């Protein structure tokens, strides 16, 4: 039996980039397991290594090329997939590392498997029964990313994602719901809905009607959110483009059907800069919508991202952005100094902002937002809330509230936690806060 196990091909896997890339990795790993391959956590024990790359910004390209180089040095047999593989037909990778066995773009499961088969033939009689219904996941067992579409129809001038991942392709709604149901049945307590543009879900198929559990469902974000809310777990929406119909999901949040959490990348507040970015709306429209959202759902948490130092951004336009920030009072914010990305249309725009000015603006922006975030967190002191346990160590636990997405938001630290496990919901009382996180005490042993 031992000799048979040694003959089973083993594959190492490196996954870089965003949650959408993580889902691609999970799909590849699921197929590998279905075909009888084993996975290895070390380069030494692997017969071959797959590296799923990111190519969005220069630092991501550098990280991906470094990871490929490390895999080649430690193992020697490397297949590259992901967004970096789509750049210049894979030439960026091949020029840096000509020894790689194959290069593919993102969401290229058939091509990756073909390369694996060529360089490491699949074993006979794969034990497909070893595959759980929810597939192979790289996240903790109690939460999972649910990717509802690929690609994007927008052509934001700072972004090259459409050139790497293509135009919008929505997954059939019955497929999404079946995957969500399998995940929940496997013990997942939180579904994180992701795509390049979640609010555009179904646009490419004209909101086609599908069927789930014998009832019709439109391929549309609102209908999907409502149906996911029936599964009895936390449902969190990410990457929501600020279309008008986004307003329709806010009542679902107020009713407790989905989490009162919205991740909306506003990017800027200056109408001229937004136009140069080829982004919709303007700051006044966005501010009025934020006010309406909070009127309908007072507990809503708003996360957004912004770019400072975009080509041509004047001091007055930066001040306009800061005024928007003060007025909007967003809960969670990420800010990036504009970085030219090879192939992005914005590179051709005039009046680039000097690097030192970009960094000064980013630091100023984040100092203001940190104060806003700290003040909003401090308002939660003395309140009770349900949190989801992520980790337990001795008598302490780390959890997240409805306001906290994994990896990107804050945490809730619980001292003297009793009888709790990762993936459980418990009630806590907030006793103090800092600029990013909350500290709490456990209210009772009762778990929900």
Curated annotation (Swiss-Prot):
Chain sites annotated for binding [4Fe-4S] cluster 2: 152, 156, 159
Catalytic activity annotation: L-aspartate(89)-[ribosomal protein uS12]-hydrogen + (sulfur carrier)-SH + AH2 + 2 S-adenosyl-L-methionine = 3-methylsulfanyl-L-aspartate(89)-[ribosomal protein uS12]-hydrogen + (sulfur carrier)-H + 5'-deoxyadenosine + L-methionine + A + S-adenosyl-L-homocysteine + 2 H(+)
Class of this enzyme: transferase
GO BP term, example: tRNA modification
Keywords: 4Fe-4S, Cytoplasm, Iron, Iron-sulfur, Metal-binding, S-adenosyl-L-methionine, Transferase
SMART domains reported for this sequence: Elp3
Function according to Swiss-Prot or TrEMBL: Catalyzes the methylthiolation of an aspartic acid residue of ribosomal protein uS12.
Classification via HAMAP family: MTTase_RimO (MF_01865)
NCBIfam families reported in the protein's UniProt record: 30S ribosomal protein S12 methylthiotransferase RimO (TIGR01125), MiaB/RimO family radical SAM methylthiotransferase (TIGR00089)
Protein known as: Ribosomal protein uS12 methylthiotransferase RimO
Organism for this UniProt entry: Nitrosospira multiformis (strain ATCC 25196 / NCIMB 11849 / C 71)
Gene this protein is translated from: rimO
């Amino acid at each position: 039996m031992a000799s048979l196990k040694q003959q089973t091909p083993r594959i190492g896997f490196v996954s870089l980039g965003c949650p959408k890339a993580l889902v691609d990795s999970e799909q590849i790993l699921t197929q590998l397991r279905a075909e009888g391959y084993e996975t290895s956590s070390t380069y030494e024990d692997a017969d071959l290594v797959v590296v799923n790359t990111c190519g969005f910004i220069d630092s991501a390209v550098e990280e991906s090329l470094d990871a490929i180089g490390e895999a080649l040095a430690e193992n020697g047999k490397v297949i590259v997939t992901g967004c970096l593989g789509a750049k210049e037909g894979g030439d960026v990778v091949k020029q840096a590392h000509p020894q790689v066995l194959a290069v593919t773009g993102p969401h290229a499961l058939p091509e990756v498997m073909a390369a694996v088969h060529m360089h490491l033939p699949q074993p006979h009689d794969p034990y497909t029964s070893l595959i759980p219904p929810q597939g192979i996941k790289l996240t903790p067992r109690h939460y999972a990313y649910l990717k509802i579409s690929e690609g994007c129809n927008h052509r934001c001038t700072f972004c090259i994602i459409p050139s790497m991942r293509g135009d919008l392709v929505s997954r059939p709604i019955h497929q999404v719901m079946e995957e969500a149901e399998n995940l929940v049945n496997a013990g997942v307590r939180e579904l994180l809905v992701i795509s390049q543009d979640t609010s555009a879900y179904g646009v490419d198929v004209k909101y086609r009607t599908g069927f789930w559990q014998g009832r019709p469902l439109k391929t549309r974000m609102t209908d999907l959110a409502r149906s996911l809310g029936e599964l009895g777990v936390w449902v969190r929406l990410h990457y929501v483009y600020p279309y008008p119909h986004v307003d329709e999901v806010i009542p679902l949040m107020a009713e407790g059907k989905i989490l009162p959490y919205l991740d909306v990348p506003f990017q800027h507040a200056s109408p001229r800069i937004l136009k140069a970015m080829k982004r919709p709306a303007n700051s006044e429209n966005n501010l009025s919508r934020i006010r309406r959202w909070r009127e309908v759902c007072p507990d809503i948490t708003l996360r957004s991202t912004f770019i400072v130092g975009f080509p041509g951004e004047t001091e007055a336009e930066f001040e306009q952005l800061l005024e928007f920030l003060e007025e909007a009072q967003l809960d969670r914010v990420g800010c990036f100094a504009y970085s030219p990305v090879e192939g992005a249309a914005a590179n051709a725009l005039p009046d680039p902002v000097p690097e030192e000015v970009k960094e000064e603006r980013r630091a100023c922006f984040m100092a203001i937002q940190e104060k806003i975030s700290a003040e909003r967190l401090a308002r939660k002191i003395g309140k009770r809330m349900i949190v989801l346990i992520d980790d337990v160590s001795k008598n302490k636990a780390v959890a997240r509230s409805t306001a906290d997405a994994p990896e990107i938001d804050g945490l809730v630290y619980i001292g003297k936690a009793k009888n709790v496990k990762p993936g459980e919901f418990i009630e806590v009382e907030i006793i103090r806060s800092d600029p990013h996180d909350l500290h709490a005490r456990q209210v009772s042993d009762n778990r929900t």
